[in-house]
């Protein structure tokens, strides 16, 4: 295990215009891509914009066949048909800093379209994986993802106090497309977008405030609050996750004591509260199918619900205490103890369907506490 800390690029010390170009290539799927960045530093202002794009073909694998649902599926040319894709990303960052005040603004958009291997999507059919002569086309089934993110960070520093705040908005739109298919003859194809199997539109609003108190050279405290609200809407002829509303908030206190360069103690406590409102989802076509098969009303009522309505409140605390001892340049000792709490996600409470992106069936448990 480990932790990766992604640190943003340092702001140039002097006024300048700068940029870079990066090219990318991979043999496993014929990836061709590149990234272009252009930036400027002018007195108190610093800005840069980056655009990246890559195209890739069907993935190569070291086998001539796979087994899916007990059926052997051939892999022609050792390439997974229809696993090609495209990615386009663009991001803009602007920062203003003057004396004790600093603010930055960021906007980014990430787009991806990738195909699904048809031999492992839906009912096994070897004819769907026959080589079509084009290793870079994207046909049904496929997925599309677009993620928009807008954030701002504001900060003001006094001699022994630093106040900061963040606001953010994210829109995550995901679609999975596959030729309309159903297990029940009574289910008609939708009039609009008949091949749209799944679609999720998740909007997230977030805010946070932190106050950092520097009492002395050896002691500092951080007091903070954050909150988030999410709304997820769905569409498509299949089902994986219901519509839901999720609101969370939390307060924290952290403290660090460093009497010298050899020893330090840090600790903190946090309390989180959350509310989850999940809509029920009824499969009327399954209910009709079971009714025609002669199931009794009690069995039909049990099986027809993809998800049940959930209205739950959650709240609990987390705490931690850590010691760091550095007796020499070659030795470091760390001791940590803590208790953690995490609010469950909507998928953990109410998912019920095949998630092709992770190649598994997911089923939530509404009784999680």
How would you describe each model-predicted region?
Residues 218-222, 226-230, 236-369:
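Structural signature of Gram-negative outer-membrane beta-barrels, strongest in the C-terminal barrel
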Residues 63-78, 119-136, 179-195, 277-310, ...:
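Solvent-exposed loop segments that connect transmembrane elements
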Residues 81-87, 101-159, 163, 169-203, ...:
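Flexible loop and strand-edge segments within Gram-negative outer membrane beta-barrel domains
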Residues 17-21, 47-49, 101-105, 161-167, ...:
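Transmembrane beta-strands of outer-membrane beta-barrel proteins
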Residues 23-29, 42-44, 53-57, 98-100, ...:
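Transmembrane beta-strands of outer-membrane beta-barrel pores
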Residues 29-55, 68-117, 146-158, 214-219, ...:
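Transmembrane beta-barrel wall of Gram-negative outer-membrane proteins
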Residues 1-23, 32-37:
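N-terminal periplasmic accessory domains that precede
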